[in-house]
From Swiss-Prot:
Subcellular location: Cell membrane
Protein name per its UniProtKB record: Uncharacterized protein Rv2307c
UniProt superkingdom: Bacteria
Predominant cellular place of this UniProt entry's protein: membrane
Cited Pfam families: Hydrolase_4 (PF12146)
Membrane topology annotation: Multi-pass membrane protein
Record-linked PANTHER family: ALPHA/BETA HYDROLASE DOMAIN-CONTAINING PROTEIN, XAA-PRO DIPEPTIDYL-PEPTIDASE-RELATED
Taxonomic source organism: Mycobacterium tuberculosis (strain ATCC 25618 / H37Rv)
Annotated keywords: Cell membrane, Membrane, Transmembrane, Transmembrane helix
TM segment ranges: 8-28, 97-117, 147-167, 210-230
GO CC terms: peptidoglycan-based cell wall; plasma membrane
GO BP annotations, alphabetical order: symbiont-mediated perturbation of host innate immune response
InterPro entries to which the protein is assigned, alphabetical: AB_hydrolase_fold, Hydrolase_4
Family: To S.pombe bem46 and yeast YNL320w.
Length: 281
């Protein structure tokens, strides 16, 4: 063995050791890198809309989750939307969205997952799925809500939560804002050197589930989204069954106001829901 090769071996070993250490750290801390909850406190629902109510959604595993409920104002049982948030913050960051959706004539349930907004527990794929099921049950049980006219709205990671819920409990319509195909694929956009498919504890495989959704689907993407590229959203809607719609908001990034309560997005949602049982006559 040459002297040069002898010197190279320790360098290779050090690089391998460092890489292994980085991978082990990421594996052990991955949920801290996926979920970014705000601990609260969260303001009252009535500070957003006068008729808003602070509510508690209880999951099957005993979690008591805080939420906001904004009932529609038309009287009787009517249409509603369940909002599944993205991976960061809490429901207060979606107040403008709640007001905008309520303005379409919908009752709105905006809740926080476990670990978010002062709620107990720690977030995980299984936990968020349980939280969404509990929220859907709560909303369906309200006297002013027609269970046959409930839409789901999912934002980013929440879109994956909404897809999973829609497979189990089909809504009247499914609206997905900035959805990805799977957590591994969106992660690969940002960390292409990591073997994410092997490392991830949570997968959110929406691309494998979307064809099993038996409801009209609207996908909305930002044309300049550098967190969840529109190409991933486009692939997801391509895998969905008809009827489906795909809307790109040009020049808009993942967290821009246009994807919170922007006119293009809201007009697309209004037109779409009017074609479904949610707002259709």
């Amino acid at each position: 063995m040459s002297l040069k090769r002898c010197r190279a071996l320790p360098v290779v070993a050090i690089v391998a050791l460092v890489a292994s250490g980085v991978i082990m750290f990421i594996w052990s801390q991955q949920r801290r890198l996926i979920y970014f909850p705000s601990a609260g406190p969260v303001p009252s629902a009535s500070s957003v809309l006068p008729a808003g109510r602070d509510v508690v959604v209880e999951t099957q595993d005993g979690m008591r989750l805080g939420g906001w409920y904004f009932p529609h104002t038309s009287g009787g049982s009517g249409p509603a939307v369940l909002v599944c948030n993205g991976n960061a913050g809490d429901r207060s960051m979606r107040a403008e969205l709640a007001v905008a959706l309520h303005g379409l004539g919908l009752s709105v349930l905006l809740f926080d997952y476990r670990g978010y907004g002062g709620n107990p527990g720690r977030p995980s794929e299984q936990g968020l799925a349980a939280d969404a099921r509990a929220a859907q049950e709560w909303l369906s049980g309200q006297s002013d809500v027609d269970p046959a006219r409930i839409a789901y709205f999912g934002e980013s990671l929440g879109a994956a939560v909404a897809v999973g819920l829609a497979v189990q409990r089909p809504p009247a319509a499914l609206v997905l804002r900035s959805p990805f195909t799977s957590l591994a694929e969106v992660g690969a956009v940002h960390y292409p050197w990591l073997p994410l498919r092997r490392l991830l504890l949570d997968h959110y495989p929406s691309i494998e589930r979307i064809a099993s959704v038996h409801a009209p689907v609207l996908v909305i993407a930002g044309g300049s989204d550098d967190i969840v590229p529109a190409t991933l959203s486009e692939r997801l809607v391509a895998a969905a069954a008809e009827p489906k719609r795909y809307v790109v908001v040009p020049g808009v990034g993942h967290n821009d106001p246009e994807l919170l309560d922007g006119r293009v997005m809201l007009d697309a949602i209004r037109r779409f829901l009017t074609e479904t049982a949610v707002l259709g006559q």
